[in-house]
Design a protein with these regions (language model features):
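Single conserved hydrophobic/aromatic residue that forms the stacking wall/gate
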Residues: 1-10
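Gly/Thr-rich phosphate-binding beta-strand-loop-beta motif of the actin/hexokinase/Hsp70
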Residues: 82-108
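C-terminal nuclease/phosphodiesterase catalytic domains that cleave nucleic-acid phosphodiester bonds
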Residues: 49, 53, 57-58, 97, ...
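Short, glycine/acidic-enriched loop or turn micro-motifs at the edges of active sites
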Residues: 95, 120, 150
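ATPase catalytic-site recognition across NTP-hydrolyzing enzymes
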Residues: 18-91
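Nucleic-acid-processing active sites and adjacent nucleic-acid-binding tracks
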Residues: 73, 80-81, 105-146
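Conserved AAA+ ATPase "SRH/arginine-finger" region at the nucleotide-binding site
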Residues: 14-16
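Extended C-terminal subregions enriched in glycine
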Residues: 142-156
C-alpha cells in the first residue's frame, strides 16, 4: 500500500491548477525534464479530456459526457441589431468547503439564451457575495434568483444589501428546489444544448472563472459520478427559471435602464 506521502505525490497534478507551473520539474544528466513548457506543449497536443485524465489526475467517462463541448453553441458577440428581452441570473451557493458558488448571467433574446458572464468561485461567502453583487451590477441584470439551500436565504439577502448600498436596485429572490439534482440536470440538458450560447473559448483566459465553469460543465457525466456539479446544476436551475418566465411573462422582468 502507498504511504500517505507517496499517495499525495501520486495524486499531484502535472501543472499546478493555480500557477499553471510544473509540479515535477527536476534535472537529469544536466537537463531539465518535466518542465512547465513540456506539460503545456502536451496540453496543446492532446484533447482537454485526455490531458486532464493523463496529466492532471482527473479521470472522466468520455462516452458519458452530457455536455460534450462539440455539441454546445458558441458566440463571439451579442446580436448587434436586437434589444434583449431581459437579463437574468441564477445563483447556486456553495454548500460545502469544496463546492463552488456558481452564478451564470443570461442575456435573453426570444428563445436564445446567451451566457455572458459567470461567478464561479470556491472562495468563502465573504468573497463571493461582493463578487456576485459586482457581476449583477456590471451586467445590468434585471432579476436574480438564488437557490434557497442551507444558507441561500441569507446569502441572497446579503448580496441585495451590497447592491442597495451601492445605489442600485435589482430584483433578488430565493427559490427552494425539491427535484433531484441529477434528474434536474438531465431534464434541462436538451434545452441547454439547443438554445444556450456560450462564449467562444478564444474569448476568455485559461484559468478564468468562465474557463473553470466551462471545464466543469463539459466534463460532467450522465452518471453524475464527478467530484463537482455546481456548473451544470446552476445552468439547470437557470433553464428552469427561464421556462417559468416564458409564455409572455418575460417582459415583466425588463432590465433597468
Amino acid at each position: 500500500a502507498l504511504s500517505s506521502a507517496a499517495s499525495d505525490v501520486y495524486k499531484r497534478q502535472a501543472l499546478d491548477p493555480i500557477t499553471d507551473e510544473s509540479n515535477y520539474e527536476y534535472e537529469r544528466e544536466g537537463q531539465k525534464v518535466f518542465t512547465t513548457a513540456y506539460f503545456r506543449e502536451q496540453r496543446e497536443l492532446l484533447s482537454a479530456e485526455q490531458f486532464e485524465s493523463e496529466f492532471q489526475q482527473q479521470p472522466f467517462e468520455a462516452k458519458g459526457l452530457l455536455f460534450n463541448k462539440d455539441e454546445l453553441n458558441y458566440f463571439f458577440e451579442l446580436p448587434p441589431d436586437r434589444e434583449p428581452d431581459t437579463i437574468i441570473a441564477v445563483g447556486d451557493t456553495a454548500e460545502s468547503g469544496s463546492d463552488s458558488t456558481s452564478m451564470p448571467v443570461a442575456v435573453i433574446y426570444g428563445t436564445e439564451v446567451y451566457i455572458v458572464d459567470v461567478v464561479f468561485d470556491d472562495a468563502p461567502a465573504e468573497v463571493t457575495k461582493p463578487e456576485c453583487a459586482k457581476c449583477l451590477i456590471f451586467n445590468k441584470v434585471a432579476s436574480a434568483t438564488f437557490e434557497a439551500n442551507n444558507a441561500g436565504q441569507y446569502y441572497a439577502r446579503d448580496v441585495a444589501d451590497i447592491i442597495r448600498q451601492q445605489g442600485y436596485s435589482i430584483g433578488i429572490r430565493t427559490k427552494r428546489t425539491i427535484s433531484n439534482k441529477q434528474t434536474r440536470i438531465e431534464f434541462a440538458s436538451d434545452n441547454i444544448k439547443k438554445n444556450f450560447y456560450f462564449k467562444h473559448p478564444t474569448t476568455y483566459k485559461r484559468g478564468s472563472q468562465y474557463w473553470n465553469f466551462m471545464k466543469e460543465l463539459t466534463t460532467y457525466t450522465r452518471s453524475g459520478k464527478v467530484p463537482h456539479d455546481d456548473a451544470p446544476d446552476s445552468l439547470a436551475l437557470l433553464e428552469n427559471e427561464i421556462r417559468m418566465l416564458s409564455g409572455g411573462k418575460i417582459e415583466i422582468f425588463k432590465r433597468p435602464c
